[in-house]
A protein has these predicted regions:
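Glycine-rich phosphate-binding active-site loops on the catalytic face of alpha/beta enzymes
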Residues: 69-74, 117-133, 167-176, 183-185
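Conserved N-terminal beta1-alpha1 strand-loop-helix module at the mouth
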Residues: 1-100, 109-110, 144-150, 154-166, ...
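Hydrophobic, well-structured mid-protein blocks that either form specific transmembrane helices
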Residues: 97-102, 106-144
Length: 185
């Protein structure tokens, strides 16, 4: 039941954004974007945060880390997120040298383009949510220059290597972050 509400909130948020700024205009805004996606090497130091924690944890404390993974998924549990919520990615990009990976409920090319415009270096796609659309979304993200990671519950990652996925998000039960990035060779 909660899953249906989350997807409805996602659709509302996406519809509102697209009504304010069309896909074509969002694409054209890339020509004014000062932040090209950076290549993500096999990093060891990742911090997982929510959008609210970016201001308090990272910018105010000036935390130094190789990579920041900003998880927007929780925003859909409480309603349709604000159209301005992704601006935290741009703020982080301007004020921190860390690589930025955007984790969200990605279901459209519009969202991937928006992530790039806001300053992300990579995205985490949810295999369970996308199912057969995973390949198309991964290919589009790669064409944009974004590094692609996948959240999966499958123990075998062979099929993901064929898609050009850089790594997977794994659950780690007794760690501070509860998750970690595992790079595919």
């Amino acid at each position: 039941m909660q899953e249906i509400g989350i997807l409805e909130n996602l659709q509302k948020s996406l519809s509102l954004k697209e009504s304010m700024l069309s896909y074509e205009m969002l694409g054209k805004s890339l020509s004014y974007n000062p932040y090209l996606p950076r290549v993500i090497p096999q990093i060891k130091d990742c911090v997982f945060v929510t959008p609210d924690e970016v201001l308090g944890k990272l910018l105010e404390e000036n935390t130094r880390t190789e990579c920041v993974i900003v998880n927007f998924k929780g925003l859909y549990e409480i309603g349709a997120p604000s159209v301005f919520d992704l601006e935290v990615l741009g703020l982080l990009r301007r004020h921190a040298s860390s690589l930025i990976v955007h984790q969200d409920l990605f279901i459209s090319h519009y969202q991937l383009l928006e992530s790039l415009v806001q300053g992300s270096d990579g995205v985490i796609l949810d295999e369970e949510l996308l199912k057969e659309d995973l390949k198309g979304m991964a290919e589009f993200a790669w064409r944009l220059g974004l590094s692609v990671f996948v959240e999966t519950h499958k123990p075998d990652y062979t099929h993901l290597k064929d898609l050009g996925v850089l790594g997977v998000l794994e659950k780690v039960p007794h760690s501070q972050n509860q998750k970690k990035i595992v790079f595919l060779d």
